[in-house]
């Protein structure tokens, strides 16, 4: 087996600000990652890519909440929004990589929607710290807080306020054996996003 390199892509590097939230903007952002991965593959590494999803999962969750409030559609739990963003972001990265890998014909990228096992008593459930979604002004935050008293917000890097959710310490990646098998078969794996 070749040397394994794990490349971590921040969700905030895919959506840099509120003006860059579209799928088109995100697809452009991951193209640079694909170019870097192609260079690494030329150096004969096996590669696993993982990615954050803070802005994306917050948008998906808020979209589901608005659809519930306005249209009575069922709420989507946060865990399902995480899986949705793993698939969506993974698809964008996979597509960008496969487009660049196609002329070389050897490797293919594949996305694995990944679950992690956590401790149900993890303090992260009591004290959420993971910023998600868009940035809000102080007034917007106050309005959202009044409408949703159980939500928590933090000021994030001088750019505004963001909602925070639990981010417990992962204990085990459930799909680790499948990821390992895919690497051994020569795939570039995109997994453990979130």
Label the model's feature ranges.
Residues 1-50, 59-66, 77, 181-186:
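N-terminal glycine-/serine-/threonine-rich phosphate-binding loop
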Residues 8-10, 50-51, 110-115, 191-193:
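Short beta-strand segments
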Residues 11, 87-90, 194:
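Glycine-centered flexibility motif
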Residues 13-15, 54-58, 117-121:
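Short, active-site-adjacent cap segments at secondary-structure transitions
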Residues 21-24, 85, 194:
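Aromatic-enriched hydrophobic runs in primary sequence
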Residues 67-189:
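Ligand-binding beta-strand-loop-alpha-helix segment within the catalytic cores
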